[in-house]
């Protein structure tokens, strides 16, 4: 059995203590409540303070939870609300398209897959929740880069690797792709990330009309394309799914 790291256990206990009871606690209160020496408690508090998880009141010297915890908590709630709102619609999209469906959000310099619906057949498939995809070559990544200014900056700053001979890497060409994405309301990846694989994605917006994620389908090129072009009924299905999730998030009509 793996051994727990004592300092992390103590830090977690400290955060739980600050989250309950009085709004602010002094060093002595924290140390005595957790059975720690003052020096040990102070060292942990100082580290948590440096990371933004704990704040110290200048006047009283007492400690309280910091803004970084609020930011992390808000991110957690946003992602889980997005996934919850998308469950029914992504299942419908998988059934109507016959392809696998991915729901992605911006995470650092890539796309984090937060929901994955298998292609509705008997083929062997691997669950990809928690996987990362590049911003510059995938349909999900292009959508986020086109609509989210933060994702756009991350995509431009990242190392845009050429996965195939179709991958767009040059900044000017990439910007042109994003212009096209915004103009038509969806993004495509036809063998730009994986040989023989194509994907279509569209943006999801929240009640503030801010981009919060992207939804898309992925499958073999011969199934998603016809005579060298994306099948329009699949593009429409993806866009309809994105609009439906956006409406459920309070975005209104799109």
UniProtKB/Swiss-Prot annotation:
<keyword id="KW-0319">Glycerol metabolism</keyword>
<comment type="function">
    <text>May be an activator protein for the gylABX operon.</text>
</comment>
<dbReference type="Pfam" id="PF09339">
    <property type="entry name" value="HTH_IclR"/>
</dbReference>
<dbReference type="InterPro" id="IPR014757">
    <property type="entry name" value="Tscrpt_reg_IclR_C"/>
</dbReference>
<dbReference type="GO" id="GO:0045892">
    <property type="term" value="P:negative regulation of DNA-templated transcription"/>
</dbReference>
<dbReference type="GO" id="GO:0006071">
    <property type="term" value="P:glycerol metabolic process"/>
</dbReference>
<keyword id="KW-0805">Transcription regulation</keyword>
<feature type="domain" description="HTH iclR-type">
    <location>
        <begin position="5"/>
        <end position="67"/>
    </location>
</feature>
<dbReference type="InterPro" id="IPR036388">
    <property type="entry name" value="WH-like_DNA-bd_sf"/>
</dbReference>
<protein>
    <recommendedName>
        <fullName>Glycerol operon regulatory protein</fullName>
    </recommendedName>
</protein>
<dbReference type="InterPro" id="IPR050707">
    <property type="entry name" value="HTH_MetabolicPath_Reg"/>
</dbReference>
<dbReference type="InterPro" id="IPR005471">
    <property type="entry name" value="Tscrpt_reg_IclR_N"/>
</dbReference>
<feature type="domain" description="IclR-ED">
    <location>
        <begin position="82"/>
        <end position="251"/>
    </location>
</feature>
<dbReference type="InterPro" id="IPR029016">
    <property type="entry name" value="GAF-like_dom_sf"/>
</dbReference>
<keyword id="KW-0238">DNA-binding</keyword>
<feature type="DNA-binding region" description="H-T-H motif">
    <location>
        <begin position="27"/>
        <end position="46"/>
    </location>
</feature>
<keyword id="KW-0010">Activator</keyword>
<dbReference type="GO" id="GO:0003700">
    <property type="term" value="F:DNA-binding transcription factor activity"/>
</dbReference>
<dbReference type="GO" id="GO:0003677">
    <property type="term" value="F:DNA binding"/>
</dbReference>
<keyword id="KW-0804">Transcription</keyword>
<dbReference type="Pfam" id="PF01614">
    <property type="entry name" value="IclR_C"/>
</dbReference>
<dbReference type="InterPro" id="IPR036390">
    <property type="entry name" value="WH_DNA-bd_sf"/>
</dbReference>
